């Protein structure tokens, strides 16, 4: 296509990740400039409130958007090309493989839910960050033509003989990248899930003394909704 590529990836300052190392390796293979961003973890409590201000609601929103608070300030280009939400077409999560892969109807039900506006790996909340930095967030996997292609396939057709074989076989460039691991959850592989668990002892953030971060996320969404109705934190806690 004649486009100049500059590759970006991130890792936590406490947790080197496979995705980060592989992105750097592939950039070297194709002779692309590469910028690796180490996300500082010491600011997590403050960053939590930044995510609340972005109206993050679910645990997935908080965890998936968090690192990009630090990535976008480092991006110099106008257009940001991403494979955002690609994994939704493949149904590679544990939940999908247990409950949704066995019939086309179930598989499409899973994908319909995944790509619903309030889900989609937190796309709407990610885009708020890209808009804040005046970037054009380009997401080919969210186009209608790509959706139609994948929805025409069953779970077996998109995952056998190996994950993402349609895409990897369509471009000769993938032959140069070597072996790539199967799907890795962004939040788990990067260490973000474990990092967010460290907020549970924080009484200001975990103000209802929850044992799960997903419940803390819901509490803050509820608090945001309550504030919109001009109530106070004390009223919300009652």
Stretches with model-predicted labels:
Residues 1-174, 187, 191-199, 233-237:
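ATP-dependent adenylate-handling active sites, centered on carboxylate activation for C-N bond formation
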Residues 174-238:
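Peripheral terminal appendages
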């Amino acid at each position: 296509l004649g486009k100049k590529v500059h590759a970006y990836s991130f890792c936590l300052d406490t947790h080197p990740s496979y995705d980060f190392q592989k992105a750097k390796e592939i950039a070297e293979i194709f002779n692309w400039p590469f910028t690796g961003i180490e996300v500082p973890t010491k600011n997590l409590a403050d960053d939590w409130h930044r995510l609340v201000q972005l109206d993050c609601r679910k645990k997935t929103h908080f965890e998936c958007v968090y690192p990009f608070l630090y990535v976008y300030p480092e991006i110099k280009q106008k257009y940001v090309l991403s494979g955002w939400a690609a994994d939704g077409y493949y149904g590679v999560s544990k939940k999908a493989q247990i409950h949704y892969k066995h019939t086309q109807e179930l598989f499409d039900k899973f994908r319909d839910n995944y790509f619903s506006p309030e889900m989609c790996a937190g796309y709407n909340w990610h885009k708020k960050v890209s808009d804040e930095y005046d970037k054009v967030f380009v997401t080919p996997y969210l186009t209608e033509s790509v959706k139609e292609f994948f929805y025409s396939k069953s779970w077996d057709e998109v995952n056998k003989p190996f994950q993402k074989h349609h895409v990897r076989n369509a471009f000769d460039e993938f032959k140069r990248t070597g072996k790539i691991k199967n799907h890795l959850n962004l939040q788990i592989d990067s260490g973000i899930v474990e990092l967010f668990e460290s907020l549970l002892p924080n009484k200001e953030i975990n103000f209802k003394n929850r044992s799960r971060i997903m419940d803390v996320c819901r509490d803050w969404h509820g608090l945001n909704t309550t504030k919109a109705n001009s109530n106070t934190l004390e009223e919300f806690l009652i």
